[in-house]
A protein has these predicted regions:
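Domain-level signal for soluble alpha/beta catalytic cores
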Residues: 1-312
Length: 312
C-alpha cells in the first residue's frame, strides 16, 4: 500500500496501533519462554484477532501483525519450527479479518512485523534465509508494508533484514530502539541493560551499542521510507527524534514502551497514564513525528486517547 508513503509525503499524521505481545499477556494469553507472543498464534488465535479489532475501534490507521517473534530461528528454538508458514500466514489472516470485521471511515493498512528477536546467536547466512522466508510469507499473505522492529544491533543483522524486506517491493519502515548516553549522544539499543540490568530479553545487545547516527547512515539508504523510535524510554524519545532529524530527512515517528520486562512477561509497573502519554506525544508531534503509536505496555486506551487528540 504505497498510499501510506504518499500520505506521509503529504504531511499527514498516521496512528499506529499499540503493543501486541504485552496486551495479549494482559488479557491472559500465556507467553512462551522462547517464542514469546508467537505462541498465541497456535493456542489462542481468536484473541489475537480481537486485539486487532479493538485497536481499529480505538482509531488505529495501521495494524501490526503478531509476527515479531515468528521468524524461523525463534520458532525452531521453541520447538515450533514446523509452524513457520502457518503462524505467519495466520497472523496476517487474522489482521485482515479484523479489518474486514470492523467498519471504520478510514483506510487501514496492515504492517508485517519482523524483528531481531531471538536472532543474536544466529549466523548471518541463517538470518538471511530466515528473514527472506518471513518477508516473502508476509508479502504473499497480503500485508501492505513491512515494519522492521529492531531493539538493538548489531547493525549488520539489521542490514540483512532490511535487504530482504526491501526485496519484496513493499514499503518498509524501520524502527530502532535508542537510549541517550552520558554525553547526550543517542545510541542504538535498549537502555534497560545499560543501567539497571532490567528489561533483559532476547533482543539485548551483546556488544557496545553504536551511535544511532551510524546506524541511520548505514541503514536508511537501503530503502526504508520512514524511521521510527521503538521500545525506548519515554524520556529518551525527544532527543532520539532530534538525532533522527539530523541524519535523515524523511518521515519520522515514535512508539515507546511503558513498564518493565522480566521475561517472558511484561511487568505493568511505573506506567504512564493515557492522558500523560498524549501530552508527551504532542511534544513528539512538534518535533516532526508523523507516526505515533505504542510498544510494550501501551494498549487500546492509549490509542483511543491519541486518536482523540490527533483526529488526523
Amino acid at each position: 500500500m504505497f498510499v501510506l508513503d504518499q500520505r506521509l509525503r503529504n504531511g499527514e499524521f498516521l496512528l499506529l496501533d499499540g503493543a501486541i505481545g504485552t496486551e495479549l499477556q494482559r488479557i491472559g494469553v500465556p507467553m512462551d519462554d522462547v517464542a514469546w507472543c508467537a505462541r498465541a498464534m497456535r493456542d489462542q488465535p481468536d484473541l489475537v484477532r480481537v486485539l486487532h479489532e479493538n485497536y481499529l475501534k480505538a482509531g488505529a490507521d495501521i495494524l501490526t501483525t503478531n509476527t515479531f517473534s515468528a521468524a524461523r530461528h525463534v520458532l525452531e528454538a521453541a520447538g515450533m519450527g514446523g509452524l513457520v508458514d502457518d503462524m505467519n500466514f495466520k497472523a496476517v489472516r487474522l489482521a485482515r479479518q479484523a479489518r474486514d470485521n470492523i467498519d471504520v471511515p478510514r483506510n487501514v493498512a496492515i504492517a508485517g512485523s519482523m524483528s531481531r528477536f531471538g536472532g543474536r546467536q544466529t549466523d548471518s547466512a541463517a538470518l538471511e534465509a530466515n528473514y527472506r522466508e518471513q518477508a516473502d510469507i508476509l508479502a504473499e499473505s497480503g500485508v501492505d508494508m513491512l515494519l522492521l522492529e529492531f531493539l538493538g544491533g548489531p547493525i549488520i543483522n539489521i542490514e540483512i533484514a532490511m535487504k530482504e524486506a526491501v526485496s519484496t517491493g513493499l514499503p518498509v519502515w524501520l524502527s530502532l530502539s535508542s537510549w541517550i548516553d552520558e554525553g547526550q549522544e543517542a545510541r542504538l539499543g535498549n537502555r534497560g541493560h545499560q543501567s539497571t540490568g532490567r528489561n533483559q530479553g532476547p533482543w539485548d545487545m551483546v556488544s557496545e551499542d553504536p551511535l544511532l547516527s551510524e546506524a541511520i547512515d548505514r541503514l536508511m539508504p537501503l530503502g526504508a521510507s520512514a524511521l521510527l523510535v521503538i521500545h525506548s524510554e519515554i524520556y529518551d524519545v525527544i532527543p532520539t527524534l532530534e538525532a533522527m532529524k539530523r541524519n535523515w530527512d524523511g518521515p519520522i515517528g515514535a512508539y515507546p514502551h511503558s513498564g518493565d520486562w522480566v521475561g517472558p512477561n511484561w511487568q505493568f509497573v511505573n506506567m504512564i497514564s493515557p492522558e500523560d502519554y498524549v501530552e508527551v506525544a504532542k511534544d513528539w508531534r512538534q518535533q516532526g513525528a508523523q507516526i505515533v503509536g505504542g510498544c510494550c505496555g501501551i494498549g487500546e486506551d492509549y490509542i483511543k486517547s491519541l486518536r482523540a487528540a490527533f483526529p488526523g
